[in-house]
């Protein structure tokens, strides 16, 4: 792996690779045009991925307050909930209310996870900016997650694409296809490069706007990140935008993010206080911590557009409703060093 100094230079050289410019991508009016895009784009997933696996229901008001604070910190994309049946994931029984509130924030793109075309139709009707659809590279994990084969889920993605295309051009949300267990599976073990590329190819052929590679159970290493990203780029071509969704299960989350930067990735998912995990992946717990990721990137000279002081305020909201054992983050323990220049 290249040194951090080299990575910093590489970040500037590859700045345009994989960036979306929001004025052309998201149709919902924004409060003000961006002066320039940040070097690295972070999607905050705590309101959805961070809460879905909790065995306690977080009050609707708290979810809305969390989203408010995240948006106020300058985060430009928020995964705000999932349009799934409440009996499957009770945490999102209030998704319609939460999503309506989230969409009042014009400075951020608001996205939602959907498991099928019915969920997509609800998300489209709600007016979301982005729809996230997951297919596992692992057949076993896909069956556990959505009770469908990989082939059946690919057909489901095509149906979602068709539902979006049926809307007027100005009312079509962006569609991201996420490949779960891209770097290993707690149910199957190793996941082959071919299995990941198969799903990536299906997403590209169905005209996904973006493809996400998810380290669902935190088994990735920096070397493996580079290998899989390179393989997927060969499969779908350099014009496809890729993002990484990393977990810190085994402590390699930030190292894997640096490997992603070296591989040309400029879009990452993360969760405040490291919330999250997959309810159908035994042993998986904890997305990479947004606060720690922002600090690292800014220290590397890569802008995120996020006000770290404001982002840290999310901990107070979470601590009122979520047990401390679920809340992590080095920056919360050590505090923000004076050397960090504000990203605001």
Stretch-by-stretch model annotation:
Residues 20-344:
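Catalytic cores and adjacent flexible loops of soluble metabolic enzymes
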